[in-house]
């Protein structure tokens, strides 16, 4: 990106201020996600709230000057984030440069980038049962009872490994949105995102079979990605999602990240309902992101007997449980491919689809209203071994 001479000159005015800042103050701004899975030399820089676009352009000129003095091997500024309430960027650079950047009065804090992973487990043979569970008060049903609106008018952004949009399950309702995996094609190379999309809005497997789907690729063929890449995906949704009509579904996670949580929270404030996986470590979900993001709908997994899956994270940040063991849905490889897998990744799209379904029914104009509706109609007290979590199973309010 090119900058005018006037911006570069303006940036130079800030350099003495940056150089003069105490070293302790610089280091105090630099945080680590609660993780061992740090991405070396990659950082997420978060601006103070209220910083305007002119200030940001000036800051990028200042950063360019800082980087010009350092090793050229680093890539420099990558993803840029511009969600109302959350502005910043990702940068690859050395520790010396990041210390200078931290000294800027425009920077609120900086977080070391961390890895995220798809929250899916082993592949098994099995049969579809999740749709029956979320449309009946009792276990064991093989039928899905739902209103014919089926999520019509709603859009679900699947922030994941992409979607095989040509799959017959999607009937032309899935499209490509954005790709934040460098050098990868605009398709799902893993299968995880396609499986989640099928549970959300597939013709056969979907909770909201008339909802629209948008693929936002942040995970590679191995199901891996970065916090900075996920935030880039969230930024895309925040800029394109329609207030009150959009759902963001994320069946992924990693260790706690304040930056990732902040991006989620800002997107919710902008009118997008966000549904996230609790995680698969059988641990307290408050230590994971985006599971711990405030006001996101965090989903744990149960099996066909309403028992919390042993892998499912738990705790006070959970909002609801949904089917997550032996869930059958669409897959990659052919237009009719399917697969049966387990994980909180599989529970999450049931609830994302439910959110889209409820939006399609009408009368819900905000993420808070959607979350409240899911909580009010859910099946209370049926989860075995909730382990300190809310005892609530997702339900669409239709079947007996």
Swiss-Prot record:
Official protein name in the record: Subtilisin-like protease 2
Role this protein plays: Major secreted subtilisin-like serine endopeptidase. Preferentially cleaves substrates containing hydrophobic residues at P4, positively charged residues at P3, small or flexible residues at P2, and large, bulky residues at P1. Mediates the degradation of collagen, the major structural protein in the mammalian host. Degrades the nonhelical regions of collagen that function in the cross-linking of the helical components. May function as virulence factor involved in epidermal wing necrosis observed in white nose syndrome (WNS) in bats.
Activity as a function of temperature: Optimum temperature is 20-30 degrees Celsius.
Gene it is expressed from: SP2
Activity regulation, short description: Potently inhibited by the serine peptidase inhibitor chymostatin. Also inhibited by antpain and PMSF.
Organism: Pseudogymnoascus destructans (strain ATCC MYA-4855 / 20631-21)
List of glycosylated residues: 82
Keyword Protease carried by entry: yes
Enzyme class: hydrolase
GO CC aspect terms: extracellular region
Active-site residues (renumbered): 160, 192, 345
Primary site of residence: secreted
Domain Inhibitor I9: 42-117
EC id: 3.4.21.-
Keyword Protein biosynthesis on entry: no
Pfam families: Inhibitor_I9 (PF05922), Peptidase_S8 (PF00082)
Keyword field: Glycoprotein, Hydrolase, Protease, Secreted, Serine protease, Signal
